[in-house]
Every structure is written in structure tokens, then in C-alpha cells.
Amino acid sequence: MISILRRGLLVLLAAFPLLTVAAQTPHDVVQGTTTELLGDLKANKEQYKSNPNAFYDALNRILGPVVDADGISKSIMTVKYSRKATPEQMQRFQENFKRSLMQFYGNALLEYNNQGITVDPAKADDGKRASVGMKVTGNNGAVYPVQYTLENIGGEWKVRNVIVNGINIGKLFRDQFADAMQRNGNDLDKTIDGWAGEVAKAKQAADNSPEKTVK
């Protein structure tokens, strides 16, 4: 009897972390990830400034589990191109996409000096899709809006899109991918291998857009 109880307790303890993750709300996911990321950044910022690879590994470790990289990659390619891609091409694009995005946008995190971040309650949570807003205070004191779209995938909420300061990142990258495919004569490998340059162009386009602050 004791042996059965012990085994039952071990099973319960092993399953508890999974139950905890599954029970997280969209707000919990965004708030928890933000808190962990900023805590790690505060402790290791100087190291990350001199070691970009360590910074990428940290971002991937913290953000990877809560980002729907597969869904985002297919969305950027759109059905037109993703259905033609081999599993190897999709995997390569995912890796190039994640690394280039974190490299180009990670610099903004290194410049963050605890000015202030507020995560709003989730909106339109129907159990499958939800939106979570965030307000980020810049160095100049202005407050910028960020909007996360999350989807429930297998009982876990994962980020599917982000709107930063009024700029829809998913749409921006979709347009950039389609334009690159045109310029590359529909050569999927060439577009995938040159994706870092496309992210740089997208970032420049975003940087040149008018700023939208929260009043």
C-alpha cells in the first residue's frame, strides 16, 4: 500500500509542473516571460554586450518555449511558399528567422534601463486566441504600446504575432518575404539564406515609421 502511494505521489509531482504551465493565462505567460527576461538581462547585461552568442542563447532559452516559431514561420512564408518548402527548408528558415530577429531587436533590450514596463490584462480570451497589451516607457519618458497575439496550442499559450508601436511585425515580415522572393526569382533557398538582410530592411522600415505613444 505504501509503495502504491509513493508511486502515486511521484507521478503527481512529476505532472505538477505540466499542470502549472497548462493553467497559465495569456497574461501570466507575457508577464512571467517579461519578468524572467528582464531579471536575466539585469544580471548579465555587461556579459551580453561583449558576448552576443551568449545573449542569443539566453533569449532563445527564455523566449523559445513561449513563441510559436513554427506558426510564425509559416505565416511569414504564407501558404503560397510554405507548402512548397521541404521540412529542411522550413527548419532552416525558423532558425535564421529566430537568430536574425533576436540579433537585430536584442540591441534594444541591451539599451533598456528599467524605465518601466506594464502588462495589461488579456483581451478577447476565448480559450483559443487572446490579446495582451504592454506599455513600455522609453529613455525619453514616452510610453510606447506593444500588443501580443497569443494562441492556445496543445494547452499552452504561445505568442503568434506582435504589434510594436503600431507596426504589425508579422505583416511587415510577410511583405518583406514576398518582396524577397520576387527579387530572387522565387528561389526559396536564396531567400532563406539571405533572411538576415531582409530583417535588417524590415527593422529600418520600422525605425523610419512615425512614433506612436500612449497618452
From Swiss-Prot:
State its location(s): Periplasm
The answer to whether keyword Mitochondrion applies is no
Q: Which UniProt keywords apply?
A: Periplasm, Signal
Q: What does this protein do?
A: Plays a role in toluene resistance.
Superkingdom field: Bacteria
**Which Pfam families did the record assign?**
MlaC
Q: Where is the signal peptide?
A: 1-22
Major localization listed first in the record, in broad terms: periplasm
What is the originating organism of this protein?
Pseudomonas putida
The entry assigns this protein to a family as follows: Belongs to the MlaC/ttg2D family.
Protein name as it appears in the record? Toluene tolerance protein ttg2D
Task: Pull one GO CC term from this UniProt entry.
Answer: periplasmic space
Q: Which InterPro entries match?
A: MlaC/ttg2D, Tgt2/MlaC_sf
